[in-house]
Amino acid sequence: MDYNVKDFGALGDGVSDDRASIQAAIDAAYAAGGGTVYLPAGEYRVSAAGEPGDGCLMLKDGVYLAGAGMGETVIKLIDGSDQKITGMVRSAYGEETSNFGMRDLTLDGNRDNTSGKVDGWFNGYIPGGDGADRDVTIERVEVREMSGYGFDPHEQTINLTIRDSVAHDNGLDGFVADYLVDSVFENNVAYANDRHGFNVVTSTHDFVMTNNVAYGNGSSGLVVQRGLEDLALPSNILIDGGAYYDNAREGVLLKMTSDITLQNADIHGNGSSGVRVYGAQDVQILDNQIHDNAQAAAVPEVLLQSFDDTAGASGTYYTTLNTRIEGNTISGSANSTYGIQERNDGTDYSSLIDNDIAGVQQPIQLYGPHSTVSGEPGATPQQPSTGSDGEPLVGGDTDDQLQGGSGADRLDGGAGDDILDGGAGRDRLSGGAGADTFVFSAREDSYRTDTAVFNDLILDFEASEDRIDLSALGFSGLGDGYGGTLLLKTNAEGTRTYLKSFEADAEGRRFEVALDGDHTGDLSAANVVFAATGTTTELEVLGDSGTQAGAIV
């Protein structure tokens, strides 16, 4: 049965506060055992119902809101509202609500004319509780101009579907999936949100994302991550099709998660890596188009690295393991350092199969002793045999990747555009002819203490074509050697140049690398690759219901 809000006194004139009239129609539908509350075309202004967890409009079992179409029926927060509103439209906190939703309308948070954090759609039970909302359907809904989240279904929700909907110009994420089970996001678009386009968090599992698009967002296009609390990781998630492009950070970030498949997507033009796997296991990256990323920093198109949460809630070091990257077409921008790169942080068991990689400075760099490449001849890094301390490791006339061991190695790239990583120990590095990259994957690879020097020496750095890759170390740029910067200086004779930090780790080690000759006039961000600005993903606290303390990013 349909309940027309105008029969309950709603005007939809863009001026009057219609909250009470719309809620009366919802209550009538619920009292009758369920139904559809219909809002004809018009702008319906609403105010806060009371506490943040009361929202503006409270849906109940069996009740759906329906309008005349996105942009035709608009529910808009009144000017001057100064209250926190956890869901302009929402379900009740602490109650199990089922068989409800909304379709064919727009929610407008009016963020330019209000204050207080306002979310668009919110539903969920109680974090950590045994109950859940069930059977939720949202179709053809636009959520815009919220100061908080656009769509924010929360823990726990079972069998939720959001399809053919849009979230844009919101202050945080466009779409959140916070502890959803057996749920689907399909054919949705998130753009121009201040943070992520899509944020999948807090133990969400058995979840499918099909043909969604995220572009022009202030952080990542799509994030799948655990978050602040020590909970079960998001898992068994399929991301199929769609596009993630022109976002400020990663196109897709998979962090502290497991059993994820990303396939058939177009990922391009993002500020950082196209895909970043960060402390995740059993990830499959299949048949995607990944291209022209690294727009804001020198980073790989696809980056595999582990995540250190030992100081966090879990006390765990999340090693990235068992990543399968197959059948992708990967091409780089001018800043793309590698097509696919593993960090030297324990990441291992990566399988790279039949990927087409072009237009990057180097195609592949792997450190894991069990990681493999097939379909790309010559892409596997060359590594010295055990006990090669002091023995030379020499490349040939092609583009080589030379990896030192734990001793004082000597690496000579020979001809070609080579990658040299001396590893631990005091190494001597020579790129030879070609545009070479000298990689430092850990601060302890090249350092000094108050009593000893263990820095590597680069013998033939050519500033016009060679590069020093420090992106794994977290330094932000050149400076005075403090605050995450490196000081550039020469010795008294001007025969040796140093890049050095004055900030020691717990063992008293301060990063330092030496270059033969005076390079004070030619080392810059053009040939020294620092950590990408804003590419680390902190675990920020997110707002939940009016009684919850917080969630994750």
Swiss-Prot record:
<keyword id="KW-0016">Alginate biosynthesis</keyword>
<dbReference type="Pfam" id="PF08548">
    <property type="entry name" value="Peptidase_M10_C"/>
</dbReference>
<comment type="function">
    <text>Converts beta-D-mannuronic acid (M) to alpha-L-guluronic acid (G), but introduces almost exclusively MG blocks, producing a polymer with non-gel-forming capacity.</text>
</comment>
<comment type="similarity">
    <text>Belongs to the D-mannuronate C5-epimerase family.</text>
</comment>
<dbReference type="InterPro" id="IPR018511">
    <property type="entry name" value="Hemolysin-typ_Ca-bd_CS"/>
</dbReference>
<feature type="repeat" description="PbH1 4">
    <location>
        <begin position="204"/>
        <end position="226"/>
    </location>
</feature>
<dbReference type="Pfam" id="PF13229">
    <property type="entry name" value="Beta_helix"/>
</dbReference>
<keyword id="KW-0106">Calcium</keyword>
<protein>
    <recommendedName>
        <fullName>Mannuronan C5-epimerase AlgE4</fullName>
        <ecNumber>5.1.3.37</ecNumber>
    </recommendedName>
</protein>
<dbReference type="GO" id="GO:0005509">
    <property type="term" value="F:calcium ion binding"/>
</dbReference>
<feature type="region of interest" description="Disordered">
    <location>
        <begin position="367"/>
        <end position="427"/>
    </location>
</feature>
<keyword id="KW-0677">Repeat</keyword>
<dbReference type="InterPro" id="IPR006626">
    <property type="entry name" value="PbH1"/>
</dbReference>
<dbReference type="InterPro" id="IPR039448">
    <property type="entry name" value="Beta_helix"/>
</dbReference>
<dbReference type="InterPro" id="IPR011049">
    <property type="entry name" value="Serralysin-like_metalloprot_C"/>
</dbReference>
<feature type="repeat" description="Hemolysin-type calcium-binding 1">
    <location>
        <begin position="403"/>
        <end position="420"/>
    </location>
</feature>
<feature type="repeat" description="Hemolysin-type calcium-binding 2">
    <location>
        <begin position="421"/>
        <end position="438"/>
    </location>
</feature>
<feature type="repeat" description="PbH1 8">
    <location>
        <begin position="320"/>
        <end position="342"/>
    </location>
</feature>
<dbReference type="GO" id="GO:0005615">
    <property type="term" value="C:extracellular space"/>
</dbReference>
<dbReference type="InterPro" id="IPR051550">
    <property type="entry name" value="SCF-Subunits/Alg-Epimerases"/>
</dbReference>
<dbReference type="InterPro" id="IPR024535">
    <property type="entry name" value="RHGA/B-epi-like_pectate_lyase"/>
</dbReference>
<dbReference type="InterPro" id="IPR013858">
    <property type="entry name" value="Peptidase_M10B_C"/>
</dbReference>
<dbReference type="InterPro" id="IPR006633">
    <property type="entry name" value="Carb-bd_sugar_hydrolysis-dom"/>
</dbReference>
<feature type="repeat" description="PbH1 2">
    <location>
        <begin position="157"/>
        <end position="179"/>
    </location>
</feature>
<dbReference type="InterPro" id="IPR011050">
    <property type="entry name" value="Pectin_lyase_fold/virulence"/>
</dbReference>
<feature type="repeat" description="PbH1 5">
    <location>
        <begin position="234"/>
        <end position="256"/>
    </location>
</feature>
<dbReference type="Pfam" id="PF12708">
    <property type="entry name" value="Pect-lyase_RHGA_epim"/>
</dbReference>
<comment type="pathway">
    <text>Glycan biosynthesis; alginate biosynthesis.</text>
</comment>
<feature type="repeat" description="PbH1 3">
    <location>
        <begin position="180"/>
        <end position="202"/>
    </location>
</feature>
<dbReference type="InterPro" id="IPR012334">
    <property type="entry name" value="Pectin_lyas_fold"/>
</dbReference>
<feature type="repeat" description="PbH1 7">
    <location>
        <begin position="280"/>
        <end position="301"/>
    </location>
</feature>
<dbReference type="GO" id="GO:0042121">
    <property type="term" value="P:alginic acid biosynthetic process"/>
</dbReference>
<feature type="repeat" description="PbH1 1">
    <location>
        <begin position="133"/>
        <end position="155"/>
    </location>
</feature>
<dbReference type="GO" id="GO:0016853">
    <property type="term" value="F:isomerase activity"/>
</dbReference>
<feature type="repeat" description="PbH1 6">
    <location>
        <begin position="257"/>
        <end position="279"/>
    </location>
</feature>
<dbReference type="Pfam" id="PF00353">
    <property type="entry name" value="HemolysinCabind"/>
</dbReference>
<keyword id="KW-0964">Secreted</keyword>
<dbReference type="InterPro" id="IPR001343">
    <property type="entry name" value="Hemolysn_Ca-bd"/>
</dbReference>
<keyword id="KW-0413">Isomerase</keyword>
